[in-house]
A protein has these predicted regions:
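A short acidic, amphipathic alpha-helical/loop segment
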Residues: 70-74
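Walker A (P-loop) ATP-phosphate-binding motif of ABC ATPase nucleotide-binding domains
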Residues: 1
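Conserved phosphate-donor/acceptor-positioning beta-strand/loop module used by diverse small-molecule
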Residues: 78-96, 124
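Hydrophobic anchor at the beta1->P-loop junction of P-loop NTPases
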Residues: 4
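Loop/turn-to-beta-strand initiation segments
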Residues: 55-62, 81
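Small-molecule kinase domains that catalyze NTP-dependent phosphoryl transfer to phosphate-bearing small molecules
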Residues: 98-159
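P-loop (Walker A) phosphate-binding loop of NTP-binding proteins
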Residues: 7
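Conserved substrate/cofactor phosphate-moiety recognition/catalytic segment
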Residues: 10-57
Length: 159
């Protein structure tokens, strides 16, 4: 399972969609679960859905995961890798303003300020790379993790 997390507007959903497309093109079954909601109940529901997904292929979960308790809940599910997607606050605010389902700007500020960084297996700064490059990096990491599940465990790959 791959959890793509970060503040609103960082690019998580765009990147997760690109990753799903790349893997699907390669014949890998992919389940993508997404939520923009910030409630504990939502994360419990996401965890239940992700845990019940078939074990073949890749399960992608896209959400802020800005609270450590939500990260811990997902880590308890087993073989889970966290990809932390970051961007500057200015970038997150601008992207939020330009998307169809923008959240309240105050919400972006709160999540950005209160975001508890996960012990990420891969970190991507979307101020430094585009979604296509970010997706390529994640797919490469997924392939590495599949070949050697212990690889880079607990140590972030900064790309």
């Amino acid at each position: 399972m791959i959890v793509v997390c970060g503040p609103p507007g960082a690019g998580k959903t765009t990147i997760a969609t690109h990753v799903r497309h790349r893997l699907t093109q390669r014949g890998v079954p992919v389940r993508l679960f997404h939520s923009d909601d910030f409630s504990s109940r939502t994360y419990e529901q996401l965890a239940d859905q992700a845990a019940s997904a078939p074990s073949d292929g890749v399960t992608l979960v896209d959400g802020t995961f800005y609270r450590r308790e939500w990260q811990t809940r997902f880590r308890a599910l087993g073989d889970v890798r966290f990809v932390s997607v970051t961007a500057s606050l200015a970038t997150c605010l601008e992207r939020n303003r330009n998307r169809a389902n923008a959240i309240d700007e105050q919400g972006v500020h709160v999540v950005y300020r209160e975001f508890e960084e996960p012990n990420a297996d891969l970190e991507i700064d979307t101020d430094q790379c585009d979604p296509t490059t970010a997706a390529d990096r994640i797919v490469t990491a997924i392939e590495t993790w599949a070949e050697d599940p212990a690889s880079e465990s607990g140590r972030p790959l900064r790309r």
